[in-house]
């Protein structure tokens, strides 16, 4: 089957689309990436999404409108990846669309029950592309008592499980998440959870202090010095000591967090602040390994992926934090994979599993009561 996986993440840098060929289903699936592209959001669209993400500035009319606007954007992104690959759109079998997360409530707080909302109307995508769309992957896991995240572990089992090596797959998108993928000869369970901020705080600080969307290659952070009092403040965030399974998002590490941090530590230079929040991402990742993984698993390899793996300063900080450990550290590119395409490929794989009625959540990662088939199916016009 030819499937387009579509992902718009918490970093809001654009729409990632992977055109993938998949043979079979389940853990023996054969996956081939045909083409990958990122379609950037225009400034107006990015501003609308940011407005919708904030409780202070959002409203139901905006979210309702944005749902259809994003559906059209996702459809156009699918057309673009097919055009770039010289692949006829009519030959596309499925589209797996994650959507844009507007709010994610992994656990009940008072009368606010656990829930999640991703938008990007699948009916619009199906109509515009004349292709079946599978979307809303997180909701069934949450209906089964899970946190709806992380969902990439299933694809990571298929793509990265090694015959003899135990691996950690660390994704660094807007949020960081890790998957423990034991070797094929191991009887240990796959576990996965969010490790805290990935690029989210770094990007927000870049936008506010440098008027840049991100710190390319970590060049600015490299010019600064880590400030201990800021790092201590960040590392005292309660999320870091919550036991897995767990997930997080913009609600805990978004604009409100950065506003409080900048107000509290405004006396420090902007380069030092950026260096410190970059170290916060690295330290939160290392902390989670040392607290929740290394005591229970013998890890041979750590594989870094996502946009954050292109931040050389961040990667150096992670390497430094793990210098006493025996595991080797790689990036996706070191092993011939694409860091940028990883999550879009994952949702193509999940769409394939849903099409074949195969469960594809990992209850040991999400906390769900059982394995379930993920996603809703939207058919195109006849």
Swiss-Prot record:
What InterPro entries does its record include? Anhydro_N_Ac-Mur_kinase, ATPase_NBD
The protein's matches in PANTHER family, at most eight in alphabetical order, are given as:
ANHYDRO-N-ACETYLMURAMIC ACID KINASE
The protein's annotated catalytic reaction(s) are: 1,6-anhydro-N-acetyl-beta-muramate + ATP + H2O = N-acetyl-D-muramate 6-phosphate + ADP + H(+)
The task this protein performs is described as:
Catalyzes the specific phosphorylation of 1,6-anhydro-N-acetylmuramic acid (anhMurNAc) with the simultaneous cleavage of the 1,6-anhydro ring, generating MurNAc-6-P. Is required for the utilization of anhMurNAc either imported from the medium or derived from its own cell wall murein, and thus plays a role in cell wall recycling.
Instruction: Specify the domain of life of the species encoding this protein.
Output: Bacteria
UniProt-recorded name of the protein: Anhydro-N-acetylmuramic acid kinase
For the ligand (ATP), the binding residues are 9-16
**Lineage start:** Bacteria, Bacillati, Bacillota, Bacilli, Bacillales
Kindly indicate whether the keyword Kinase belongs to this entry.
yes
């Amino acid at each position: 089957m030819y499937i387009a996986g579509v992902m718009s993440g918490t970093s809001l840098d654009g729409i990632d689309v992977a055109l993938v060929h998949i043979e079979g289903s389940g853990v023996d699936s054969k996956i081939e990436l045909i083409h990958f592209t990122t379609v950037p959001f225009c400034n107006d669209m990015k501003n609308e999404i940011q407005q919708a993400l904030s409780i202070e500035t959002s409203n139901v009319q905006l979210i309702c409108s944005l749902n259809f606007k994003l559906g059209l954007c996702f459809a156009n992104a699918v057309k673009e990846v097919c055009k770039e690959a010289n692949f006829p759109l009519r030959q596309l079998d499925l589209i797996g669309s994650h959507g844009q997360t507007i709010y994610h409530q992994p656990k009940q707080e008072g009368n606010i029950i656990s829930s999640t909302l991703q938008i990007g109307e699948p009916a619009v995508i199906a109509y515009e592309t004349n292709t079946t769309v599978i979307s809303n992957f997180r909701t069934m896991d949450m209906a089964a008592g899970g946190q709806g995240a992380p969902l990439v572990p299933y694809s990571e089992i298929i793509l990265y499980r090694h015959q003899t090596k135990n691996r950690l797959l660390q994704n660094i998108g807007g949020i960081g998440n890790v998957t423990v993928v034991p070797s094929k000869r191991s009887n240990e369970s796959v576990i996965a959870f969010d490790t805290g901020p990935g690029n989210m705080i770094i990007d927000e600080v870049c936008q506010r202090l440098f008027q840049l969307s991100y710190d390319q290659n970590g060049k600015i952070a490299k010019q600064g010095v880590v400030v201990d009092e800021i790092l201590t403040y960040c590392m005292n965030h309660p999320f870091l000591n919550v036991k897995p399974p767990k997930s997080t998002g913009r609600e805990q590490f978004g604009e409100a967090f950065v506003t409080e941090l900048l107000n509290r530590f405004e006396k420090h230079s902007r380069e030092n602040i950026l260096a410190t929040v970059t170290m916060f991402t690295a330290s939160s990742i290392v902390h989670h390994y040392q607290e929740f993984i290394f005591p229970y698993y013998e890890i041979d390899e750590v594989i870094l992926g996502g946009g954050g793996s292109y931040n050389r300063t961040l990667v150096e900080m992670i390497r430094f934090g793990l210098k006493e450990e025996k595991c080797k550290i790689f990036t996706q590119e070191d092993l011939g994979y694409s860091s940028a395409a990883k999550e879009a490929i994952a949702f193509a794989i999940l769409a394939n599993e849903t099409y074949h009625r195969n469960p594809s959540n990992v209850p040991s990662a999400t906390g769900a009561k059982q394995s379930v088939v993920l996603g809703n199916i939207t058919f195109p016009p006849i």
